[in-house]
């Protein structure tokens, strides 16, 4: 809340603190905790919030979050009891489509706590490039977890990937140039870079 973030993406270090801590802190914070793939065992709904809709300068921005899907392999079950973690690649396109249909956002950001990976679908904790290759209707994909600074954009410059690394060494920066005609977004061009923190 102090940093005035619009939302935060749940990461493995949040879950490591256990239910007593993260459930209490989440209730105390105004900032939404996002993790659409952390699913409750009792009712199949998300344990955390799936997404947030933000309005800025006449634009509607959707931020959809996801936790690392490999949590159960690292942490003892009592830390995450009552939920399971769905692979992000298997669920995110449907969530993007749902949010687009329900809210008609001008901008869609997918914020994840998954590593960059190689894009070959082989590592559950590293779904970043797998998502980048497969997602449609997304403007920016934010990744983390592996502490590996990496940015890229697709050939059309309509989809950007940002992993700022770790330890506040970089600020991941995404720039989106938007053309609006008759009140509607008609074109978007993205760029990404890392700004070193000195």
Give residue spans per PLM region.
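Acidic, metal/ion-coordinating pockets
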Residues: 1-197
């Amino acid at each position: 809340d102090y940093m005035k973030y619009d939302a935060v993406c749940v990461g493995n270090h949040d879950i490591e603190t256990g239910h007593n801590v993260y459930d209490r802190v989440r209730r105390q914070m105004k900032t939404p905790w996002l993790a659409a793939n952390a699913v409750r065992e009792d009712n199949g709904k998300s344990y955390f919030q799936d997404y947030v809709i933000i309005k800025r300068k006449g634009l509607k921005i959707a931020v959809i979050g996801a936790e690392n899907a490999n949590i159960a392999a690292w942490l003892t079950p009592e830390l995450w009891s009552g939920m399971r973690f769905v692979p992000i690649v298997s669920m995110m396109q449907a969530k993007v489509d749902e949010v687009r249909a329900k809210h008609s956002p001008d901008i869609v950001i997918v914020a994840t706590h998954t590593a960059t990976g190689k894009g070959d679908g082989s590592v559950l904790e590293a779904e970043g490039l797998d998502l980048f290759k497969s997602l449609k209707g997304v403007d920016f994909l934010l990744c983390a977890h592996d502490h590996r600074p990496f940015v890229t954009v697709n050939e059309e410059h309509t989809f950007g990937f940002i992993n700022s690394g770790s330890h506040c060494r970089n600020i991941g920066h995404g720039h989106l140039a938007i053309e609006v005609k008759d009140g509607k977004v008609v074109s978007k061009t993205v760029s990404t870079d890392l700004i070193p923190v000195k």
